Amino acid sequence: MKGFSIFLILVVIIVIGFFVLRKPADAPIVTDTNGTGDEVPNAPNNINEDFDGTKQIDANKSTATWTGSKKLIVDYYDYGTVDVKSGNAVFANGILTGGEVVFDMASINATSTGKNADEDKLTGHLKSDAFFDVAKYPEAKFVITSAAREGGNTYLLSGDLTIKGKTAPVSFPADVIVANGTASIAGTATIDRTIYDVRFGSDKFFQDLGDNVINDEFILEFKAVTK
């Protein structure tokens, strides 16, 4: 009888050990990112699957800045802002699938210039028909046609950008973060202004400009935040 009791105790210990040590069958397995190939259960996927549908852009929380430069003058940069007017972002199970951002071109503003002067003069010039002709074309718009998730919060956004009534494709990387019932989309695009008939100071179309040649490409950085 004593031997049987010892045997029974050993059986119980073995059974308990089996259930404690074995890995649950429903625990998701992924390969770690450090290149060792070790299996790591329950790795986060950075997706909020409850975030779904079309979300409106909050213009008061969204921002956009631009950077221009002169081609032949080292470190000559002009900086400024333009307001985000409206837009939306479309999500399916926490994944960005589409949307659009509308910019208020009448709000375009130069905050600093390469010569540290004449910001108001540059602002007026940008609004004139020599540049963006905001009286005739008060809005610019980017419409997402493809949102390819590249891992984590990083996407490659492709879409149609309309400036001065002309539309052309553009692609750029963006970070999309969903948290606390809202989303932010932050991207940086390099844009060739001459495609949109903004030719002033471009050596593609004008000669004898000297060091007043303005780079055809400018940088637009924006952050669109949903309501």
Regions found by a protein language model. Name each.
Residues 2-227:
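Low-complexity, acidic/polar, glycine-enriched regions of mature
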